[in-house]
């Protein structure tokens, strides 16, 4: 079963049709890149997935774990695991990067589980996991102690 499925999606903004019949299926653990020239609808698709009010779905459907999300508000979609990673992310003082990663990890773990059990990793377990793996993506240990996106280089933000 597809985790995210977009079926013949048509989207307009201010009465102008931007997306025309978009289809996409993603499976568990898959990573996809949406690429295209300026004005091709990449941002429109991202904002539509998150339920931005300026974008109207005129036909088609968006399914997350087999259920339509078209009637869900943005925060409800986020609780189900849909997030948008910005090209130029805002700095968030007071929110630790490792806390953000753990929250994301727990949301993804829950979404990938086949049963209804809670599957949260403790702070201690996650800190150990991070220390063992942070170097694999070319980052230093002090990276984890920073606030979200605060003082990161462009390359660090992308990682």
Residue map of PLM features:
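Helix-to-loop junction immediately C-terminal to a conserved catalytic motif
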Residues: 50
């Amino acid at each position: 079963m597809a985790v995210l499925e977009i079926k013949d999606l048509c989207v307009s903004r201010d009465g102008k049709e931007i997306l025309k019949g978009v289809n996409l299926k993603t499976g568990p653990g898959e990573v996809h890149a949406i690429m295209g020239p300026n004005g091709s609808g990449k941002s429109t698709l991202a904002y539509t997935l998150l339920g931005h009010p300026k974008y109207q779905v005129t036909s088609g459907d968006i399914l997350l774990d087999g259920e339509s999300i078209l009637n869900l508000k943005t925060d409800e979609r986020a609780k189900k695991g849909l997030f948008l990673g910005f090209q130029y992310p805002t700095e968030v003082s007071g929110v630790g990067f490792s806390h953000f990663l753990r929250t994301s990890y727990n949301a993804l773990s829950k979404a990938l589980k086949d049963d209804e059990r809670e599957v949260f990793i403790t702070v201690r377990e996650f800190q150990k996991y991070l220390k063992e793996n942070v170097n694999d993506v070319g980052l230093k240990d002090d990276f984890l102690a920073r606030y979200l996106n605060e003082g990161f280089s462009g390359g660090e933000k992308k990682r």
